[in-house]
Amino acid sequence: MAEQQKGLTYADAGVDIDAGNALVERIKPAAKRTARPGTVSGLGGFGALFDLKAAGYHDPVLVAATDGVGTKLRIAIDTGEVDTIGIDLVAMCVNDLVCQGAEPLFFLDYFATGKLEVAQAARIIEGIAEGCAASGCALIGGETAEMPGMYHKGDFDLAGFAVGAMERGADLPQGVAEGDVLLGLGSNGVHSNGYSFVRKVVELSGLGWDAPAPFGGDSLGRALLAPTRLYVKQALAAVRAGGVHALAHITGGGLTENLPRVLPEGLGARIDLSAWELPSVFRWLAETASMAEPELLKTFNCGIGMIVVVAADRADEIAALLAAEGETVTRIGEVIAGEGVSYDGRLL
């Protein structure tokens, strides 16, 4: 009797269930380290549970945010430097949550690739866990999708989803008024927006990712992968102190597009560009691309990753509090009557 032919398996189609299970086991300790009051369940269930009462809330309003890392991923993939890209993913979500006045509570990630490499995926998700722990946010679940034929070899994509809460009536922006002071919190470089432009500039420069960064520091690739700053704990400390009327996360659209999102109709902002030094990475990008200053200001954070809008009579106190939390704080302008953002001085 002829030997029975072996049937086709899921692994033959390119999906390795065992690799997925191995990844879950490997990242469980990192996820466990992010546990906080309210965390009920660990990884592995069909859904993840979170107890708002145990987290200390009485009449909470939930706030949700989702985001990705954009084409910064391309640099991480091309250089193999994937350890901090997960921090970027968390920062892009939780920094948005805090702008609504919410405390980040829990986070879920989505990791998709053509062929799951457990070691690579673990490095990425451990970075996500690091960002969550630094934000007081529990990593309570996620999805790993192995999809052969959908991605080139070695490529992957990331998305994140965060949920936070605040007590009813504590949402931001609230009470923004003419004369309010704008406090700028320093960025850590490009953060996670504008990387399609960045990659085009690098192409024009003729430099490789392993070349020394023209603006100083490490290799060009590593310098451009500096992780997005997490502003959660220090921003929440300022909010709880009172006097904070709004927070604006400076992402895609730069200062020009993001600050107006937290200003009520009839109010604009005046920013003094001479108040801070343009970081060298932005100067290099602008000079290499012959980029006009208005374009720079509506593309990048230009060294200011978060703007805190505060009552004028509380500005010094809030600035001191933020500085004590480790922030680089600069008084960059004020809220004025009008619309949009106007600028005094020059960055370039």
Swiss-Prot record:
GO molecular function, one term: ATP binding
Pfam family, one: AIRS
Subcellular location: Cytoplasm
Disulfide bonds: none
Main location: cytoplasm
Pathway(s): Purine metabolism; IMP biosynthesis via de novo pathway; 5-amino-1-(5-phospho-D-ribosyl)imidazole from N(2)-formyl-N(1)-(5-phospho-D-ribosyl)glycinamide: step 2/2
Assigned EC number: 6.3.3.1
Recorded catalytic activity of this chain's protein: 2-formamido-N(1)-(5-O-phospho-beta-D-ribosyl)acetamidine + ATP = 5-amino-1-(5-phospho-beta-D-ribosyl)imidazole + ADP + phosphate + H(+)
Alphabetically ordered keywords of this record: ATP-binding, Cytoplasm, Ligase, Nucleotide-binding, Purine biosynthesis
Keyword Amino-acid biosynthesis among record annotations: no
GO annotation terms (biological process): 'de novo' IMP biosynthetic process; adenine biosynthetic process
InterPro entries the record matches: PurM-like_C_dom, PurM-like_C_sf, PurM-like_N, PurM-like_N_sf, PurM_cligase
One GO cellular component, as annotated: cytosol
Family label: Belongs to the AIR synthase family.
HAMAP family (alphabetical): AIRS
Name of the protein: Phosphoribosylformylglycinamidine cyclo-ligase
Highest classification ranks of the organism: Bacteria, Pseudomonadati, Pseudomonadota, Alphaproteobacteria, Rhodobacterales
